[in-house]
């Protein structure tokens, strides 16, 4: 019985480590041909890559748009915001009419988390979250959600004008 309990505890521990590793930022190999400094989001992988050059990138786990809410293409970072207030877009407000018109930055109910990188061409952003359990899923209306510690890291590494490419 004692050996079985130890094996179960060891298995549970290994599973927790594997889950944590899948949920962690990491340095990975990345194909050539993408300009260093570019952010690449692969929605099928639910991962965001910051291309560093020399065949390397930082990979972060993310949540992406639900089916029917995803978008693909190229944008650029056009704003950097710490603890941003959030005004629900019309589609979100229509689906959730009880939402207030504005949720203050820093509020636990604010879905933007600790920081946001707004993207050119629309209402989309790469931002933190108040729902960390959604990371790794198809959860949003099109924004890219990151763990708060990851958006804080990415926020420091990118600047206005950074290209962002979203692919399948």
Language model features with spans:
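Bacterial N-terminal signal peptides that target proteins for export
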Residues: 1-10
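Bacterial N-terminal signal peptides
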Residues: 9-17
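Sec/Tat signal peptide C-region and signal peptidase I cleavage site
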Residues: 19-24
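Exported/periplasmic cell-wall-interacting domains
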Residues: 26, 34, 54, 59, ...
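Conserved interaction-surface patches within small, structured recognition/assembly domains
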Residues: 31-40
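Structural recognition of beta-strand segments within beta-rich domains
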Residues: 40-42, 49-50, 145-146
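Residue-level signal for tight coil/turn positions that link beta-strands
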Residues: 43-45, 121
């Amino acid at each position: 019985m004692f050996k079985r309990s130890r094996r179960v505890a060891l298995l549970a521990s290994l599973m927790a480590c594997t889950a944590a590793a899948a949920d962690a930022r990491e340095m990975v190999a990345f194909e050539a041909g993408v300009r260093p400094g570019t952010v690449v989001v692969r929605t099928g992988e639910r991962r965001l890559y910051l291309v560093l050059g020399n065949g390397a990138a930082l990979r972060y786990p993310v949540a992406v748009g639900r089916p029917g809410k995803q978008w693909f293409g190229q944008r650029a970072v056009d704003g950097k915001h710490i603890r941003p207030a959030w005004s629900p877009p019309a589609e979100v407000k229509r689906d959730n009419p009880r939402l207030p018109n504005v949720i203050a930055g820093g509020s636990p109910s604010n879905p933007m988390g600790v920081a946001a990188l707004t993207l050119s061409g629309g209402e989309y952003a790469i931002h933190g979250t108040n729902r960390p359990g959604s990371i790794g899923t198809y959860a949003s209306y099109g924004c890219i959600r990151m763990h708060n510690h990851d958006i804080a890291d990415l926020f420091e590494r990118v600047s206005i004008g950074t290209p962002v490419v979203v692919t399948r």
